[in-house]
Amino acid sequence: MRISSGFLAVATVCLALAAANAGDGYRLLEMNGHDVKWGIAKSGTGASLSYAVVAGPSASSGINNCRAITGVNTLLARSGLSALQFDGELAAAFGMWENAADIHFFPAKNPAAADLLIAAEAAPDGVAYADVTPASSGGQRFDRIAKGIVCLNPQQFWSAAEGPLAGRPVIDRKSYRLRYVLAHEIGHVLGLDHPSPSGELMSFEYSGRLEGLQPGDIAGIVALYGPSRARSATPIVALNLAGR
């Protein structure tokens, strides 16, 4: 996934647009002719993913995007963000999906073995990308996802401000809402594609005014993993968890 000229566009060869329930406000991610998800290769079944935030140069790479990744320190320094702020925005992005569906994220004990890596691009390009590595599930409708990477361009300016960026002083530069972009890219890693130009968090048109998952986003993630066991699947507003 790439953000360019105000729009989010898929920047990959193999991530094809899947024609799955677009009329319901979501589209499932199709790879090699199969929809993809974590956990059991069956719709409506939950999953748990370990994650790690990359701290420095990494040998890990994606199969299409995020081919060279590194730690987020340069990104934080350029945007004037602390590690605590970054962790809070990431927790809020995870929380959007956890509050809607039976999906759970937990810190990996061994970062090298994490299911999902959060990193910066070592060769900065675009704004943000997601990479998904599928594992064959024996000809079923779904292929299981084996690995995911989200990588952000450290040369862009990132904001951890609560609420839309409207009214924020702009000094000849464009800021991207870290929480929004992380949540969007995580949505790809979970198995969702772009359903439409606008209106959903997973839509490809960037909108810093969205405050959480929209009805189509929720319908899509629930179709993949079932509803959250803790909360009802209703549109939610992401909370700022920094400092907790």
What name fits each language-model region?
Residues 1-8:
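Bacterial N-terminal signal peptides that target proteins for export
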Residues 19-244:
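Zinc-dependent metalloendopeptidases
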Residues 9-16:
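Bacterial N-terminal signal peptides
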